[in-house]
Amino acid sequence: MAKSPAAVKAEVRRMRRIRRIHFVGIGGVGMCGIAEVLLNLGYEVSGSDLKASAVTERLESFGAKIFIGHAAENAEQADVLVVSSAVNTSNPEVATALERRIPVVPRAEMLAELMRYRHGIAVAGTHGKTTTTSLLASVFAAGGLDPTFVIGGRLNAAGTNAQLGSSRFLIAEADESDASFLHLQPMVSVVTNIDADHMSTYGGDFNRLKKTFIEFLHNLPFYGLAVLCVDDPVVRELLPQVGRPTVTYGFAEDADVRAINVRQEGMRTYFTVLRPDCEPLDVSVNMPGNHNVLNALATIAIATDEGIDDAAIVAGLSGFQGVGRRFQVYGELPVDGGSVMLVDDYGHHPREVAAVIKAVRGGWPERRLVMVYQPHRYSRTRDLYDDFVQVLGEANVLLLVEVYPAGEEPIPGADSRQMCHSIRQRGQLDPIYVERGVDLAPLLKPLLRAGDILLCQGAGDIGAVAPQLIKHPLFVGESK
């Protein structure tokens, strides 16, 4: 029987002497979910951001005090400030808090505090964190366990990226981008893969990144569980160094939990799962691609370990409605003679781009892929330039939007115009440079053919393009 919100609040230990919690940058994807859970636990929550958004309006409707813009007075009544790694001590609210000796804590430290008195499940890895965390929330809910979850994307079924559950389980993403996942002390940790990304955090040293993942896994208690994808060569390399109980997953024959007989039919992927001492389990997920099979395998490994029955696992996976901006299908965009399928995706690393392209080719092999891509950060574009050139060259038609800087200064040679030149030199594709995403509709109109798949991808403001295109007069008029 589900507990009432009051009963959940009563069972969760309070942070003594903390009444009002202020978030600097409350509209951020990593911040708003924690704020929402704290609101539901009965804390007073305030927060500031540079502009209003649907996220800040939602939090305001739940009782949060929202300030637009950063100002010293916003923080004066707070008992603690929560900040992301993007906020520094020059921020007037942080400066005021430090002057008044109000604690200033990283976002991950507040998440760790929420996890402290629960059975925490932390999902780490360069790729697949959000989808795996979301699948876990779906399967645990199907199993009647009603978890608390904090996700880096909007879970479509819940309409939010965070929710206070009635059980002892808390499922959350563990962020390696700033090494803040080291604050977490979960009972179960997942590592989906380890790739060279956010290398400035690690001084450009990949060995340091690998050691940090081992340190994260050793935050588990000696009776905890590390769930590791052995299809990833770096994770496999680190496996002998993990001094905790482990369960491995993947397509590899030596994986503890593995997938066989994979087939893709459009958006839906079917496969059979083999587990130790269990009957084979036939499952499906409403997501394309082998990368999503791996995300589902991690979920199945944990659900099986927690005793969730197979029927609930199957139901939670098959009924999963996806996550915002993770191969999110906006619908059919009318064009001459038919329509194109419009898809939005958050992928911003060459490995993620390659996985999505492979999924499109697997599910819709006869259709052209028209791709609108926006690189994210000049530093990532520079560090992974050759990989981007190779993978983006696999599209049938490519439009490259200028790099989304995410606060960085331009780096010579690490921009979309130069990347267009490099892709063109390969002789397979003639990409189109686009300075701003708002210019896309008239460019796309003559390029699209009936039956195409139009993929808008990247982690920057390109996320606004698909919802704009579906309503754009140039395309809406086609259906009349």
Swiss-Prot record:
InterPro entries: Mur-like_cat_sf, Mur_ligase_C, Mur_ligase_C_dom_sf, Mur_ligase_cen, Mur_ligase_N, MurCDEF_pg_biosynth, UDP-N-AcMur_Ala_ligase_MurC
Protein's pathway: Cell wall biogenesis; peptidoglycan biosynthesis
Key words, A-Z: ATP-binding, Cell cycle, Cell division, Cell shape, Cell wall biogenesis/degradation, Cytoplasm, Ligase, Nucleotide-binding, Peptidoglycan synthesis
GO CC annotation terms, alphabetical: cytoplasm
Coiled coil regions in record: none
Gene Ontology biological process terms from the UniProt entry: cell division; cell wall organization; peptidoglycan biosynthetic process; regulation of cell shape
Binding site for ATP: 125-131
Subcellular location(s) per record: Cytoplasm
Source domain of life: Bacteria
Database matches in Pfam families: Mur_ligase, Mur_ligase_C, Mur_ligase_M
GO terms assigned for molecular function: ATP binding; UDP-N-acetylmuramate-L-alanine ligase activity
Broad class of where this protein is predominantly found: cytoplasm
E.C. designation(s): 6.3.2.8
Function: Cell wall formation.
PANTHER family: UDP-N-ACETYLMURAMATE--L-ALANINE LIGASE, UDP-N-ACETYLMURAMATE--L-ALANINE LIGASE-RELATED
Family to which this protein belongs: Belongs to the MurCDEF family.
UniProt name for this protein: UDP-N-acetylmuramate--L-alanine ligase
Species this protein is from: Ectopseudomonas mendocina (strain ymp) (Pseudomonas mendocina)
Gene: murC
